[in-house]
Amino acid sequence: MNPNQKIITIGSASIVLTTIGLLLQITSLCSIWFSHYNQVTQPHEQACSNNTTNYYNETFVNVTNVQNNYTTIIEPSAPNVVHYSSGRDLCPVKGWAPLSKDNGIRIGSRGEVFVIREPFISCSISECRTFFLTQGALLNDKHSNGTVKDRSPFRTLMSCPMGVAPSPSNSRFESVAWSATACSDGPGWLTLGITGPDATAVAVLKYNGIITDTLKSWKGNIMRTQESECVCQDEFCYTLITDGPSNAQAFYKILKIRKGKIVSVKDVNATGFHFEECSCYPSGTDVECVCRDNWRGSNRPWIRFNSDLDYQIGYVCSGIFGDNPRPVDGIGSCNSPVNNGKGRYGVKGFSFRYGDGVWIGRTKSLESRSGFEMVWDANGWVSTDKDSNGVQDIIDNNNWSGYSGSFSIRWETTGRNCTVPCFWVEMIRGQPKEKTIWTSGSSIAFCGVNSDTTGWSWPDGALLPFDIDK
């Protein structure tokens, strides 16, 4: 074999060996891939080895031992859902301590603050929020003109953190509404906003911002709701709806709601009673509401119901009357409205029952929505006399008040084995009592404490008129 033939033979052998080696490598890679694929995608019946891998869940700090042979599959765990539960009474209260004050009108003279009415507060386990009905306008702006009107297509329910002036930068849209309620069941927020024409208004229910149900006006006469928080217990939320005249017999429904879906409706048989704008709170396993009688009563009607929607109704017995306008304190009634020529109209308000006693929130003025005070009547839930056992001043009679309502802070937040009673007071400014082109309000909130408190005056404090009014 000559040298050239040797070179050709050696080269051919090298190429063959290289090709064989490459094929073996490819075969090995395919075998490894196929084996890995089967292990990941097919179920394993054999016992796992003792290899241990820790994983960290972003929702909660939750380190879990996962034993496997080859692969760790990371799956998010469900959050620890806590629903508000029933069974707690109201915490004992000696007086009322300031919780928040937003000063919205004062700040709005030079800041971007919404024109609002009907503010109310509601708390989840982690935060308290102020809900309010806007007019689609800002203070000291031309669109604030004429905002004394209650119902318009521009009104929306929005919310912001409690204690801050409501502005576009800190507020969250909730619902298109000129009447509303909202509450948390623990994991989520329920909102109910009523909008539309007076004769065919519709309530739109949302759970965590998603539309879940609707309810149409059944009497065709300004269907309306609480203008304060609904109440949630044991995964269900409860609210009251009114439809019918504001100055005659109207019609009422209790709604039972789960995750935004209406699961039960109860018509309230309340001939001679008038329930509007009820302020509700949890009371043991029940829900208790104190409402506005816009027809005949200067005393406030109440309704108490359980989870089956079985209910009782009556009037706050005390001769210390809670509505406005009202007569001077006198003889109350437990079962019928007290008129004395002052029973018509009214204002949203609240009371808290403690056994036979009752804390009554009310304006200081008999005729106008000015001033505010908390009055303790130790027998006022069962006795019709006018004897009070203590008064705490909130706003002096030279400053405007307005609507007021109840809310509560639950034991799941505080760790106490009771429900903390709280209330808010709206301070209406502008029309119809002041020379402005607009109507709006700020709010202040208090919670019950079983320790020392003080009375004072915490008014709105804004200097009117604004530039837009001149």
Curated annotation (Swiss-Prot):
Annotated region (Hypervariable stalk region), positions in chain: 36-88
Main location: virion
Region of interest: Involved in apical transport and lipid raft association: 11-33
Cofactor(s) required for function per UniProt: Ca(2+)
Catalytic class of the enzyme: hydrolase
GO function terms (MF aspect): exo-alpha-sialidase activity; metal ion binding
Activity control: Inhibited by the neuraminidase inhibitors zanamivir (Relenza) and oseltamivir (Tamiflu). These drugs interfere with the release of progeny virus from infected cells and are effective against all influenza strains. Resistance to neuraminidase inhibitors is quite rare.
EC number(s) given by UniProt: 3.2.1.18
Transmembrane segments annotated in the record for this chain: 7-27
Active site: D150, Y403
Segments on the Virion surface face: 28-470
Region (Head of neuraminidase): 90-470
Residues where substrate binds: R117, R151, E276, E277, R292, R369
GO BP of this protein: carbohydrate metabolic process; viral budding from plasma membrane
Glycosylated residue positions: N50, N51, N57, N62, N69, N145, N269, N399, N417
Gene3D superfamilies: 2.120.10.10
UniProt-listed Pfam families: Neur
Membrane topology: Single-pass type II membrane protein
Post-translational modifications reported in the UniProt record: N-glycosylated.
Domain remarks: Intact N-terminus is essential for virion morphogenesis. Possesses two apical sorting signals, one in the ectodomain, which is likely to be a glycan, and the other in the transmembrane domain. The transmembrane domain also plays a role in lipid raft association.
Known role: Catalyzes the removal of terminal sialic acid residues from viral and cellular glycoconjugates. Cleaves off the terminal sialic acids on the glycosylated HA during virus budding to facilitate virus release. Additionally helps virus spread through the circulation by further removing sialic acids from the cell surface. These cleavages prevent self-aggregation and ensure the efficient spread of the progeny virus from cell to cell. Otherwise, infection would be limited to one round of replication.
Subunit description: Homotetramer.
Other facts: The influenza A genome consist of 8 RNA segments. Genetic variation of hemagglutinin and/or neuraminidase genes results in the emergence of new influenza strains. The mechanism of variation can be the result of point mutations or the result of genetic reassortment between segments of two different strains.
Protein name listed in UniProt: Neuraminidase
Lineage, broadest ranks: Viruses, Riboviria, Orthornavirae, Negarnaviricota, Polyploviricotina
